[in-house]
């Protein structure tokens, strides 16, 4: 089968023929129709995170396709089902985190396109218990980003504790942020969208933001406090330190900052203000299988629709170059050619 392979960190991916995965008990083989491209894939290719991925590696954790083979012991999935293979490839199912509904914190988890091969290939295998069933009315290209960007931002909004009618600020209206905005509106929240371009501000308003702020033209912290008295929750999906600091300062007393983006920086938090104002700071990463079902349900009901651009598998290195330069609006999805 054809795949895009990382053979060496910080080098171009190689498009090559590799052996089709062989199934073990409990696994399914998926013929990939589409696979979203995430910044995590770029980090995997660069090997620049503290925990390195395996080498050689086939990246991709937003793979969507049709099940073409099932192994012994598979009961919940059948040949012909359309499924997604997400970041949470598998977990142990036995630790305190798995047993308390926090399987994304499992220390023994495997991650698609990182610790195991992922969806930048014509075929990918995965444990049947951890693939996501894709609703019949969803297009594989459009639904691919829900497997990471979608469930990640949906989960962040859940853990923020913000309730319908309350205010949430979303810092960064890019690949994650434009999806987070749609989930927030679908959940009944009032949204302040913050970015640093008029183009992103217009996009935010088009997607339903109640207030859109260009952080290069006005101080978003002052604007938020002046207009709504501070937000009940702030979600930072940006990749620069300043946005995280502003997000923290935007939160009202008793509010919550949820950290999602991963800039290479520390987050300075004033202890006195945090204690006095009862502010909570939480980290949130992807979502559980239950979160995934819920995130997909919003998409199936037409409440969330990622902005996508398609590319071919052979164009992955060009896509990564654009990603590094910040030249991508929405999400790029690799569309695999049919036989």
From Swiss-Prot:
Catalytic activity: a primary alcohol + NAD(+) = an aldehyde + NADH + H(+); a secondary alcohol + NAD(+) = a ketone + NADH + H(+)
Binding-site residues, Zn(2+) 2: 92, 95, 98, 106
Pfam families per the UniProt record, alphabetical: ADH_N, ADH_zinc_N
Amino-acid positions noted as binding NAD(+) in the UniProt annotation, renumbered to this chain: 172-177, 195, 200, 260-262, 331
Cofactor: Zn(2+)
A molecular function GO annotation: zinc ion binding
Cofactor note: Binds 2 Zn(2+) ions per subunit.
Regulation: The rate-limiting step is NADH release. Catabolite repression.
Record's keyword terms, sorted: Metal-binding, NAD, Oxidoreductase, Zinc
InterPro entries: ADH-like_C, ADH-like_N, ADH_Zn_CS, GroES-like_sf, NAD(P)-bd_dom_sf, PKS_ER
Positions annotated to bind Zn(2+) 1: 38, 61, 148
EC number: 1.1.1.1
Entry superkingdom: Bacteria
Similarity annotation: Belongs to the zinc-containing alcohol dehydrogenase family.
Entry-linked NCBIfam families: PRK09422.1
Chain's role: Active with primary alcohols, including methanol.
Name this protein carries in UniProt: Alcohol dehydrogenase
The organism's taxonomic lineage, starting at the top: Bacteria, Bacillati, Bacillota, Bacilli, Bacillales
